[in-house]
């Protein structure tokens, strides 16, 4: 929504799952003068179309931003039945392979520019896994937005989804599972809607509620994939594989239930530091909720992310 002046370029490629064609885009400055490349992954049950303000701000600051509608989301979804479904098995691996394809496109478009990888919410778990699976690719920093800490329920979640999938089918959508997964998220807030936890920006929350392509229920197979992603990026192996000298920024609202109100992000960042990672930074914004890129203080967040990239990547010796 709104009038945006940045330029765009579209791409399509087959998902590694063979379920759909992935739709991806590049947004870049009107004058074509690109200072750095940002590869950003959106979150669960949403799509790239929600990021217009972010994309305009970053194009104005000189970035070429690459995003794709994740498999089973937005335009990367062939039928309503495919929404929130990544495949009968190994869907989480397909998600990571689809990101690798977008990385290759972005790198091909800008072979000489510094690249930063980033993800919001579920996208942060995907990009955290991506960082450890592909530590030798040519990216200069990682930004994890609205991510979570160690989740003791992830193992149970995977087991439950396996059972439900076997009994009800992989595409079964369990309201019980959804309610359990997001239990308590909204208790902290006004209760104006069921998703007040997303943002203090009521217009943004209302847009989410009104958007048919947002807020849908995941299939049990996809919940299993999400659980596996969380297990992978919470494992000892993850901390061992993430490059020790990679600049890493965690960005979250202090009132974000996904990050356990900041405690989860602190736990991950502290463990990274304890395992020899020397360039870890945390930005927590008082009062802000989960969708920190669609918050009342988002312009401040955008400036802070740009400042991090400028210092850690563009001015780095």
Range-by-range predicted roles:
Residues 118, 127-213:
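Alpha/beta-hydrolase-fold enzymes
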Residues 250-252:
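Short beta-strand/loop motif that positions the catalytic acidic residue
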Residues 57-81:
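Conserved alpha/beta-hydrolase
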Residues 42-46, 254-255:
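Active-site glycine-rich loops that stabilize anionic/oxyanionic intermediates
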Residues 275, 279-317:
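Catalytic active-site module of serine/aspartate enzymes centered on a nucleophile-bearing elbow/loop
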Residues 87-107:
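Alpha/beta-hydrolase active-site loop
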Residues 110-121:
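Alpha/beta-hydrolase fold nucleophile elbow
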Residues 6-29:
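N-terminal cap/lid segment of alpha/beta-hydrolase-fold proteins
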């Amino acid at each position: 929504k709104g009038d945006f002046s940045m330029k765009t370029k579209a791409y399509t490629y087959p998902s590694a799952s063979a379920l759909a064609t992935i739709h991806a885009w590049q947004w870049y400055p009107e004058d074509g003068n690109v200072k750095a490349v940002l590869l950003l992954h959106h979150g669960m049950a949403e799509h790239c179309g929600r990021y217009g303000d972010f994309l305009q701000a970053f194009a104005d600051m000189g970035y070429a931003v690459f995003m794709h509608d994740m498999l089973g989301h937005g335009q990367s979804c062939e039928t309503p039945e495919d929404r929130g479904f990544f495949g009968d098995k190994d869907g989480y691996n397909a998600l990571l392979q689809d990101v690798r394809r977008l990385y290759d496109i972005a790198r091909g478009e800008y072979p000489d520019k510094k690249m930063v990888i980033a993800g919001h919410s579920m996208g942060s778990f995907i990009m955290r896994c991506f960082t450890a699976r592909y530590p030798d690719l040519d990216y200069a920093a990682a930004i994890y937005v609205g991510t979570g800490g160690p989740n003791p329920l992830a193992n149970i979640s995977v087991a439950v989804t396996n059972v439900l999938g076997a009994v009800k089918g992989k595409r079964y959508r369990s309201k019980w599972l959804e309610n359990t997964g997001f239990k308590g998220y909204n208790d902290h807030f006004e209760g104006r809607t069921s998703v007040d936890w997303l943002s203090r920006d009521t217009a943004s929350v209302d847009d989410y509620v009104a958007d048919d392509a947002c807020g849908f229920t995941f299939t049990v197979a996809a919940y299993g994939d999400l659980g596996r992603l969380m297990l992978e990026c919470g494992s000892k192996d993850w901390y061992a594989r993430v490059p020790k000298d990679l600049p890493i920024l965690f960005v979250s609202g202090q009132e974000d239930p996904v990050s356990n109100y900041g405690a989860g992000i602190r736990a991950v960042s502290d463990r990274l530091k304890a395992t020899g990672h020397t360039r870890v930074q945390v930005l927590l914004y008082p009062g802000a909720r989960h969708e920190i890129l669609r918050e009342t203080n988002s312009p401040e967040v955008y400036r802070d992310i740009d400042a991090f990239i400028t210092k850690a990547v563009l001015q780095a010796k």
